[in-house]
């Protein structure tokens, strides 16, 4: 079976902006939404594909992978689309993009079974060196587990009654003109049930806080904003399901090296005589000492590239480069002997030492003629 192009699915150009993609998704999702196409399996399948396409094209990293390698590239990174997801998962994604009141007339397909999100997000700071070479880090964090006294209900003895606000539906509905909207019940938070009396053990929250520490692998080449997923390390539901822990990484800046994508930049200060004469110098790089051959007449801000000495790309495995940029240092004060030596050196070059005179001689003549006419 030939893969369907995500851009064709959403009917957008390959250079479409995020807003254009979102607008196209909104239009098509409304058109093929199952509530507007009851008993129409073709529309339901199209709705699934539209959501899959949007989930990829609305994510900068996934879109870049897809543009370069197609669906195979996504699958290699663990993204398998909606094929193995339940329809409720797809509806959850739909509502996460546009909210529960999106579109009007679409009721919630299922009541939330959880009192709190199962997935957890935390942040971690690592050094420049740790990002370059990869490492292992110990993570300490807190997560929620159901209260054993009330079995996660928040009610004394676990006794619940239908929510009087939404009459047990978990949703409340209201009309605006000819449109019907729904939103999560603010009293029971979508549960459809409320406690007759609050559990004394957890004060009605339905959970307690526990602490945990785990060791995670930081891959070589990770960058700020990248997330690491620790499966089944999140909050625990009343039914025993456990969410995932997502760790967002932030890389500290280094005093000597600067990262740009997968390349590393460093500044190499040299004296003006070294630039003029040329010289081989030893420079410290993140991966050890390297020899830098300065050519005769090296220019200020001239760059020298050390291939494969940069960061490893976490997706492709290819390493970036180290770019050493020269900064020429000139003396700010001279003694008499140094001045004399420099004057002699300048004289030894003759007219070569005053390139501005040759450059500007014709301009001087031209300007004179402007005033003699």
Swiss-Prot record:
CXXCXGXG motif repeat segments: 147-154, 163-170, 185-192, 199-206
Annotated cofactor note: Binds 2 Zn(2+) ions per monomer.
SMART domains for this protein: DnaJ
Pfam families in the record: DnaJ, DnaJ_C, DnaJ_CXXCXGXG
Main location: cytoplasm
Required cofactor(s): Zn(2+)
Zinc finger (CR-type): 134-211
Gene Ontology molecular function, alphabetical: ATP binding; heat shock protein binding; unfolded protein binding; zinc ion binding
GO CC, alphabetical: cytoplasm
PANTHER family assigned to the protein according to its UniProt record, in alphabetical order: CHAPERONE PROTEIN DNAJ, DNAJ HOMOLOG 1, MITOCHONDRIAL-RELATED
Domain notes: The J domain is necessary and sufficient to stimulate DnaK ATPase activity. Zinc center 1 plays an important role in the autonomous, DnaK-independent chaperone activity of DnaJ. Zinc center 2 is essential for interaction with DnaK and for DnaJ activity.
NCBIfam families in alphabetical order: DnaJ_bact (TIGR02349), PRK10767.1 (NF008035)
Record-stated family: Belongs to the DnaJ family.
Job of this protein: Participates actively in the response to hyperosmotic and heat shock by preventing the aggregation of stress-denatured proteins and by disaggregating proteins, also in an autonomous, DnaK-independent fashion. Unfolded proteins bind initially to DnaJ; upon interaction with the DnaJ-bound protein, DnaK hydrolyzes its bound ATP, resulting in the formation of a stable complex. GrpE releases ADP from DnaK; ATP binding to DnaK triggers the release of the substrate protein, thus completing the reaction cycle.
Subunit and partners: Homodimer.
Protein's name in the database: Chaperone protein DnaJ
Protein's organism: Nitratiruptor sp. (strain SB155-2)
């Amino acid at each position: 079976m030939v893969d369907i192009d995500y851009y064709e699915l959403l009917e957008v150009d390959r250079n479409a902006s995020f807003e254009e993609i979102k607008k196209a998704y909104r239009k098509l999702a409304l058109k093929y939404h199952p509530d507007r196409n009851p008993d129409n399996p073709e529309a339901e399948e199209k709705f699934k594909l539209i959501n899959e396409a949007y989930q990829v094209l609305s994510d900068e990293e996934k879109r870049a992978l897809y543009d370069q390698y197609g669906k195979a590239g996504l699958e290699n990174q663990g993204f398998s689309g909606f094929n193995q997801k339940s329809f409720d998962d797809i509806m959850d994604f739909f509502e996460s993009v546009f909210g529960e009141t999106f579109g009007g007339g679409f009721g919630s397909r299922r009541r939330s079974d959880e009192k709190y999100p199962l997935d957890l997000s935390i942040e971690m700071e690592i050094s420049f060196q740790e990002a370059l070479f990869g490492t292992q880090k110990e993570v300490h964090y807190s997560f929620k587990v159901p209260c054993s006294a009330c079995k996660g209900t928040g009610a004394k003895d676990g006794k619940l009654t239908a929510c009087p606000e939404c009459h047990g539906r978990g949703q409340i509905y209201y009309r605006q003109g000819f449109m019907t909207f729904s939103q999560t019940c603010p009293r029971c938070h979508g549960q459809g049930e409320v406690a007759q009396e609050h559990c004394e053990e957890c004060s009605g929250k339905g959970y307690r806080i526990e602490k945990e520490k785990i060791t995670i692998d930081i891959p070589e080449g990770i960058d700020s904003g990248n997330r690491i997923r620790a499966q089944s390390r999140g909050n625990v539901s009343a039914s025993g399901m456990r969410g995932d822990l997502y760790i967002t990484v932030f890389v500290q800046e280094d005093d000597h090296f600067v990262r740009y994508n997968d390349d590393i930049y460093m500044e190499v200060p040299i004296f003006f005589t070294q630039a003029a004469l040329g010289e081989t110098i030893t420079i410290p790089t993140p991966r050890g000492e390297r020899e830098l051959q300065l050519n005769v007449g090296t220019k200020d801000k001239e760059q020298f590239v050390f291939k494969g000495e940069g960061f490893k790309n976490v997706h492709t495995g290819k390493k970036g480069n180290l770019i050493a940029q020269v900064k020429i240092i000139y003396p700010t004060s001279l003694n008499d002997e140094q001045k004399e030596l420099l004057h002699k050196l300048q004289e030894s070059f003759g007219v070569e030492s005053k390139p501005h005179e040759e450059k500007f001689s014709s301009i001087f003549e031209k300007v004179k003629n402007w005033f003699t006419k």
